[in-house]
């Protein structure tokens, strides 16, 4: 958490500042990856009001420095919705100095300082987890996670990687999102199970409804079969009773009374 010496009234507000670093994203994938993570997170944190996930939004850490706009970042311990409405930028002195605990950078064909200047800046700010996703890599891991330890970034190995301070894991998996069949980033729980996407949740609920309908139909069929079986048994009993009665009548005609035997 950063502290500012200047009185807050003297510092510019979000309305006074540009919404981003004014540098356009140079890959559609950058936004799609972050969008998917945010959409999944909305389901994981449903009902919570103490988190915010920004995408390509300007993060202002000093009134004397330009904003930096990560492809995605997560802050826990801030209001999900500001009283004045939607955030146009993330201004640290308006967020009680809460630094994003998680920052994501997606590498495109042209490097933008993900391994140098940005990494150093996030380290100096105190961002706990710095995640670099480099899908164009072939020989090295496409997902790198760094954890801040004694003011230095230390790589964390694994897939997924659990981040206990924020209660989430980050990892990668093959998936078809918006008709794009490829590797995507996902959130994971502590057991290493991947959280479902909104589309998967809808499909799962649909399957549950269909299974419930099938079970109800099967129960109805079993009940109907039981009724039919009971009816057949009763008919057989009735027929047996008629046969027994006819047999008894025939014996009486022959002078034989079964009751006297």
Predicted features and spans:
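Acidic-basic catalytic patches of nuclease active cores, encompassing PD-(D/E)XK
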Residues: 27-55, 61-69, 73
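C-terminal interaction segment
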Residues: 2-22, 43, 57-64, 70, ...
């Amino acid at each position: 958490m950063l502290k500012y010496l200047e009185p807050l009234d003297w510092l510019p507000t979000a309305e006074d500042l540009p919404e981003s670093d004014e540098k356009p994203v140079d890959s559609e994938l950058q936004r799609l990856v972050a969008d998917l993570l945010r959409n999944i997170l909305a389901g994981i944190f449903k009902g919570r009001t103490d988190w915010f996930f920004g995408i390509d939004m300007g993060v202002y850490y000093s009134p004397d420095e330009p904003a930096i706009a990560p492809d995605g970042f997560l802050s826990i311990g801030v209001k999900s919705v500001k009283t004045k409405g939607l955030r146009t930028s993330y201004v640290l002195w308006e967020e009680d100095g809460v630094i994003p605990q998680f920052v994501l950078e997606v590498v495109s064909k042209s490097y933008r300082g993900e391994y140098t200047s940005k990494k150093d800046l996030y380290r100096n700010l105190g961002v706990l987890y710095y995640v670099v996703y480099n899908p164009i890599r072939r020989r090295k891991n496409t997902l790198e996670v760094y954890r801040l330890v004694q003011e230095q970034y230390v790589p964390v190995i694994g897939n997924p990687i659990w981040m206990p301070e924020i209660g989430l894991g980050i990892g990668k998996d093959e998936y078809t999102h918006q008709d794009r069949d490829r590797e995507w980033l996902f959130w994971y729980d502590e057991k290493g199970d991947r959280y479902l996407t909104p589309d998967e949740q809808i499909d799962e609920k649909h399957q549950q409804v269909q299974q419930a309908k099938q079970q109800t139909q099967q129960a109805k069929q079993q009940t109907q079969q039981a009724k039919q079986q009971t009816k057949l048994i009763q008919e057989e009993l009735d027929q047996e009773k008629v046969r027994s009665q006819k047999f008894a009548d025939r014996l009486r005609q022959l002078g034989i009374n079964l009751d006297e035997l």
